[in-house]
Each structure stands twice: as structure tokens, then as C-alpha cells.
């Protein structure tokens, strides 16, 4: 089929991108670079340098990194186990990981709120066996737990997809040449699955950095992430200009982190890590 005759098929996608991606970004940029009078200003962007905002973004980066590392440490062994299963069982196991994602994100987080609160299910069980209740809700640990639970599938699936592309013949050849299990993993498996790891890290880190629902429900008012600050500027303070300015800075941070991940992926694909 002639490519020139099929270009029109991209028309709906272009319209969709223009309406729901490009135009909203332009609106955010206009609000972020103007004040309430409509005059040009960079004060909304520079406001990120204020102590309260720096504290929020630093806390966001910290918790996002912790959540991403935990997801990676859980997901990689899990993906290895899934790959080692028989083909008939593998599809069912993948289905079990995807199944929770069919439930609404908000409902999944509220469920964890019910489990972790002072009178929740976990503390009720602890009391039933004579143990002291734990202070789990409204803590940084609760937020990290919520992030890991919600975003873990986004780490497992890319790593698993990378693992199934590693041929058994390649691994067997390494063993035939005298490599033990550890050497085979670090010299063959890990380098070949680096693209999947990078993809998973990006897919977990970015939503963890920008989330505000998880921190609202599991962190309460005690812990404020940059997503909460931006959300409050739009909804509570009704200052769309400041909220948009902070969003622009956060967008630059995200784009920078994705660029770094892409650079690592390009250098690491198909090569050894050391």
C-alpha cells in the first residue's frame, strides 16, 4: 500500500494530540508565564525556589526514588520467576498482575487506607492476637507502600518482555563456555534486559514523582508532595498562574529524567554494564 495514500489515517491521532496534549500544554504555559493581570512574568516559575516548594519537590523525588528502587528489586526476581514458568502458566500469572489495574486507581488506594488506618484491618488483627497497634497511616512509609502497590505492574511487564527476548540458546552457550550462574546473569541476562529495566524505571518514577492522590489518602495533611502543592494551587488557592508555573518546572524535571534514562538505555543496550 502506498504510504502517501495512507497518511490520512494519522489524521484522527493528530487531532486527538492537538486537542488533548498540545493545546492544554500551551494553556499551562500561558498561565505559568503570566500573572493574574495577563502580563508576562517568570515569578511563577521562580517560585519553585521557595523553601516550601523546594521541600515538597525534594520529598517527592526522595519517595519516588525509594518506590522505584523497591519496585525494581521486587519486579526483576519476579519477572525471572515468571519467565521460568511453563508457557501455559505464564499467561495466567501475567493476567493476575494486570487484573488489579482493571480496578479504579482511586478505589485501590482507598482500600489501602482502610487497611492501614488506626482502626483498620491490620491493626484490628494485631489487637486480636494481643499485639500493640502500629502507626502506619499518614506516614512516608504508607505513601511508598501505595506507590509500590499501584505502580509495580509497570515495572514487572517491561522487564518480563525484555527477559523473554533473551534466547535460552544464548544462556546455554554462556554456560557451555564455562560461565557460572552469577557470571551468566551479570554478563548476559542483565545487560540484555537493560532496556526493559530503563523503561520500567521511567514508567514508575514519573507517576510516583507527580502523584497527589496517594499522598492525599495515605499521607494526609502531614506530608505534602509537589503534586499536592500544585493541586492545592489550582483547587484551594485558585491561583492557576502559580500552579501552572510550578507545573512547568516539574515538567522540565520529568523531561530531564526521561532524557537521562534514554541516554543510559542507548549506551547500555546489548552491552555489558561494567
Where are these regions (language model features)?
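Amphipathic cytosolic juxtamembrane alpha-helices at the membrane-cytosol interface
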Residues: 2-7, 58, 88-91, 140-142, ...
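Interhelical loop and adjacent transmembrane-helix boundary motif
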Residues: 4, 45-52, 212, 216-266
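Transmembrane alpha-helix signature in integral membrane proteins
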Residues: 51-84
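C-terminal transmembrane helix and the adjacent membrane-cytosol boundary/short C-terminal tail
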Residues: 3-13, 23, 27, 160-175, ...
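Short membrane-interfacial helix/loop motifs at transmembrane-helix boundaries
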Residues: 11, 15-54, 115-119, 220, ...
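Transmembrane alpha-helices
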Residues: 12-21, 95, 99, 149, ...
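Membrane-interfacial helix termini and adjacent extracytoplasmic/periplasmic loops
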Residues: 42, 109-148, 182, 218-222
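Cytoplasmic-entry segments and transmembrane alpha-helices of multi-pass inner-membrane transporters
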Residues: 9-10, 78-115, 171-172, 185, ...
